[in-house]
């Protein structure tokens, strides 16, 4: 009987703590801007040949809840829209999603990825997706390497 009361007491405490990650429990968010997570060859905006590249720094913005005592938080990575042709990580919808996730207790990442799509090329769309996946993998590698710095 004592064991059942102990289990029920623990469950009632856990149920009361369950709103983190669901409801916005933090008022303020800390934003770390323009964190460089890599460097890669990029295509100019208007291109006809995919061998014409320029190296660029790849950056992201990190949103974290202010005054959070958790040492480890789950991470959500947001990518902007734009069909691999346009966009950046400071578009209003991506920023709003990242702030909302950080207020719920997550670490939220809004990342830039390499753009470039030649509608006249049959392989350009596949290569654009491949570059974005590579950039997403680079963000994950960076976050794993510097996890102690960014929680």
Tell where the protein language model's regions lie, with residue ranges.
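Bacterial Sec-dependent N-terminal signal peptides
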Residues: 1-20
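N-terminal cap/lid segment of alpha/beta-hydrolase-fold proteins
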Residues: 17-71
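Short, solvent-exposed loop/turn and secondary-structure capping segments
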Residues: 47, 72-73, 86-91, 120-122
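Short beta-strand element of the alpha/beta-hydrolase
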Residues: 71-83
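Alpha/beta-hydrolase active-site loop signature
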Residues: 83, 115-117
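Serine-hydrolase catalytic-loop signature spanning alpha/beta hydrolases and amidase-signature enzymes
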Residues: 83-86, 108, 142
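Short amphipathic alpha-helix adjacent to the substrate-entry channel of hydrolases
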Residues: 90-110
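Alpha/beta-hydrolase active-site loop
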Residues: 126-149
């Amino acid at each position: 009987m004592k064991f059942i009361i102990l289990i029920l007491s623990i469950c009632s405490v856990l149920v009361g703590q369950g709103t983190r990650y669901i409801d916005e429990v933090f008022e303020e968010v800390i934003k770390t801007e323009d964190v460089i997570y890599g460097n890669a060859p990029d295509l100019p905006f208007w291109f006809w040949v995919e061998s014409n590249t320029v190296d660029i720094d790849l950056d992201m913005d990190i949103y974290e809840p202010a005054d959070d005592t958790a040492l480890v938080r789950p991470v959500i990575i947001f990518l902007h829209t734009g069909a691999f042709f346009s966009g950046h990580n400071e578009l209003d919808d991506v920023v709003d999603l990242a702030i909302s996730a950080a207020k719920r207790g997550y670490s939220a990442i809004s990342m830039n990825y390499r753009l470039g799509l030649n509608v006249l090329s049959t392989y350009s769309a596949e290569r654009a997706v491949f570059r974005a996946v590579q950039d997403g993998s680079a963000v994950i590698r960076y976050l794993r390497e510097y996890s102690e710095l960014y929680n």
